[in-house]
Amino acid sequence: MRGFILMKSLIEEFSCGAYVFEKGDTLDGVAEKFNTTKHVIICDNNLTSPPLLGQAVFIRRSESVITVGAADDIDGICRKYGAQKDEIYRLNKVNFIYPFMRLIVK
């Protein structure tokens, strides 16, 4: 019972859920399904290789992930989401953005 309580409190505290990888799943696909990024899933689960079939991972649901539009630029995104350019680059471990990129804007 203690493990269940710990799991429940972690899920509530971090607004996350568990996802079990199924045949055909990819990190990119699962990240898109839960409106997050592959990088967030890898870091949150300390993954060093792709999840195996049947492996459960924690998924932090984030409303702070956007898809960069064709006409978007970093300054416009910063204004729209009240974010700092350096912080967006740091969170995403990138030095530039491009259209259709999934971007953490926290």
Kindly label every feature range from the protein language model.
Residues 22-50, 73-101:
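LysM (lysin motif) carbohydrate-binding repeats in extracellular/periplasmic proteins that recognize
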Residues 8-33, 55-81:
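Primarily a LysM-type cell-wall glycan-binding module
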Residues 53-61, 99-106:
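Generic detector of short, aliphatic-rich beta-strand segments that form the cores of beta-sheets
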Residues 2-13, 45, 53-54, 92, ...:
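Alpha-helical scaffold segments
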